[in-house]
Amino acid sequence: MAANVKVLVVLALLQLMSLHAVVHGGDNGGVSAVATGKHEPKPKQGGGGGGGDGGCHISGFLHGKAGKCNRAHGSDCCVTGRRYPQFRCSPPVSSARPTPATLTLNSFARGGDGGGRSSCDGRFHPDTAMVVALSSGWLRLDGASRCNRMIRVAAGNGRSALARVVDECDSVNGCDAEHNFEPPCPNDVVDGSPAVWKALGLDEGVGEFKVTWSDV
């Protein structure tokens, strides 16, 4: 009788262990494996930008070439021989809700880290101007040219600001003088002037923030 009780106890323990493995996924898989798949590196999330890449994937690679790079505002300067991802698209924009993005900092002034003149109007803009650049897909490659249009940028602290789109954060080209010898942009960037950062109440020293933006 005692032997039968022991057998029943062992069987009960085995069932409990099996149930635990199913619920928690064991030591190596289950929930953590799903989480890993969910947060796989995307085309720089910026790639992928905030909120998912919407089917926008890397279209190629640019071979880096180092040069005279203005490192103001934490510029990521090209390294010779390194491969940098290129994107010919951006996450989809919906009129029903704001679009998640990564806000970066850029000077559009002459001699600033923005490189050449703004592509939309052929001008430089002082750091006090409320201006932004958008990743290539959002600026023009999704069929809706946003040059010289106004957008609203909203930060997680409850602040928002209106800014004019004056330039392209080029997601295809880079590592040359025109682009301050910086790599191509991720596909989900709103590159804002110091004035935009100030209006949003954000610390320039952080370098980038998750924000949303929408057409006005």
Swiss-Prot record:
Source organism superkingdom: Eukaryota
InterPro entries from the UniProt entry: Kiwellin-like, RlpA-like_sf
A GO cellular-component term linked to this record: extracellular region
Pfam families xrefs: KWL1
CDD domains: DPBB_kiwellin-like (cd22270)
Signal peptide span: 1-25
Keywords annotated in UniProt: Secreted, Signal
Subcellular location: Secreted
Family of this protein: Belongs to the kiwellin family.
Protein name: Putative ripening-related protein 4
Source species of the chain: Oryza sativa subsp. japonica
